[in-house]
UniProtKB/Swiss-Prot annotation:
Coiled coil: none annotated. GO terms for cellular component: cytosol. It comes from the Archaea. The keyword DNA-binding applies. Belongs to the PDCD5 family. NCBIfam families: PRK04239.1 (NF003268). Signal peptide: none annotated. This is DNA-binding protein MA_4116. It comes from Methanosarcina acetivorans (strain ATCC 35395 / DSM 2834 / JCM 12185 / C2A). InterPro entries: DNA_bind_arc, PDCD5-like, PDCD5-like_sf. Gene3D superfamilies: PDCD5-like. It holds the Pfam family dsDNA_bind. One of its GO terms (molecular function) is DNA binding.
């Protein structure tokens, strides 16, 4: 019985040391994870600010309003349109600000043609 008791005590001691080691490792990793997440969030916010600054330069207020509305209803399409507009601006293919009508035209070109399907009963 005494031998079993010693083994149980040793096993318990090993478990405690291992648990303490794991907790120590997690405590060391946690600040770096938090810091990395903070830096990533900062970079994302900075990129978003740059994107908004470019869009302010190339879109009229009405077009910006339409783009904002589009992003609320269809985020993927709004992001795609933003990236296309920024690409056009950076490549120098935009000569003047894009107004609401031009933005509508660009949106129509981006969206695939919808087929009209009708069901008729015979």
């Amino acid at each position: 019985m005494i031998a079993m008791s010693n083994m149980d005590d040793e096993l318990e001691e090993i478990r405690k040391r291992r648990l303490a080691e794991i907790q120590r490792q997690q405590a060391q990793q946690q600040p770096s994870d938090v810091q990395a997440a903070y830096q990533q969030e900062q970079a994302r916010a900075e990129m978003e600010a740059q994107k908004q600054a470019i869009l302010r330069q190339i879109l009229t207020p009405e077009a910006r309003e339409r783009l904002t509305t589009l992003k609320m209803s269809r985020p993927a399409l709004g992001e795609q349109l933003e990236m296309q507009l920024i690409s056009l601006a950076q490549s120098g293919r935009l000569k003047a600000q894009i107004d609401d009508e031009q933005l509508k035209t660009l949106l129509m070109r981006m969206q695939p043609k919808k087929r009209k399907t009708s069901i008729t009963r015979v």
